[in-house]
């Protein structure tokens, strides 16, 4: 990359960042937090945060990067995608209802407490089973990629660990004070550190717990933008330190700065992967919607499907194995736009932007229903579900649409199963005479707002 090429890229970069930041800041001033603001921040992080890091790697350390024209295509496609997404998100599809909706379900105190207990048991129970099978992998494995090898059993259990976070979200939303806020941070980060040590370097639970703590603080007005920026810097440094421990790296001086740049870029902003994918566009055999279906394979037990493929060919694995011919053991993220390109080429980019706009619009509708709900137990469940889905939104921006669909369906199934089981247990306890009727009557006095019922 020459200085002239850098100047041209920087102009496009500046226009794109100002465009997205302006729209995001206007939305932030209007509502403080919603899923459009969240997705926009994640989108900026994924596709634009890495550009300065890439430039420092190129000019400070002489690192070879994707040809500039493909980086330009990546930046332009990301900007066009966001424009189409934003128009879709802001388009009103129907007029507001004048008639009240019939509520799909209601909640009381016992059912709500049973729900978060069941969610926590799912997480703690699967962590315990994984630990009994593998021990502390952080101290046993000499390479992070071996987490996905046949030496590690029960890998599918890792998907259940995350449900500790929505469990603690229910606890927070029942109280919604500073004490509950800090309890959420302490409990979820402690659980995240435990899973980091047991699994051998998976940082997702720690990142999500800290991010949700900040988002809640923004919503409640307990955190300012300056505090958020400082927390972001702390989070980046913390994730870098955890990455060093995960990969067993011992660096200092210029090497430490170089390692910080490329690990931070790869962790938070794999935007160069999109340029790399576009560079190899002629090698892609468009997969259609098959990667979405294939990503569900991991949820099917081998006992039910003995011929189930051990390796799932989703868009990330297709990009890594078939396009790049990379078989190092770790999948290279194609990003949201890259996953659309793998599925249907550049024509899928505007279609994907429309789909994503509708997805974020639905999450915001559900979140608003939760905030407006007068039954505080039902409100806690709805808001916990929405905030608990933040991890899926991160997966959407960073990993792709296929990974998002499988994970959000899995999240809905497990969350819904715990909710239904909680109601069933409540019915059994009530039938057995274990429920105090006075408490039930007082809870039923809190009826949902007729204009905001689900």
From Swiss-Prot:
Per the record, its GO cellular-component terms are: plasma membrane
Give the stretches traversing the membrane: 3-23, 39-59, 61-81, 119-139, 154-174, 180-200, 201-221, 222-242, 340-360, 377-397, 409-429
Does the UniProt entry include the keyword Lipoprotein?
no
Pathway annotation from the record: Bacterial outer membrane biogenesis; enterobacterial common antigen biosynthesis
Q: What is its main location?
A: membrane
Cross-referenced InterPro entries? WzyE
Q: What is said about its interaction partners and assembly? A: Probably part of a complex composed of WzxE, WzyE and WzzE.
Summarize the protein's role.
Probably involved in the polymerization of enterobacterial common antigen (ECA) trisaccharide repeat units.
The protein, known as: Probable ECA polymerase
Q: Which species expresses this protein natively?
A: Yersinia pestis
UniProt lists the gene as: wzyE
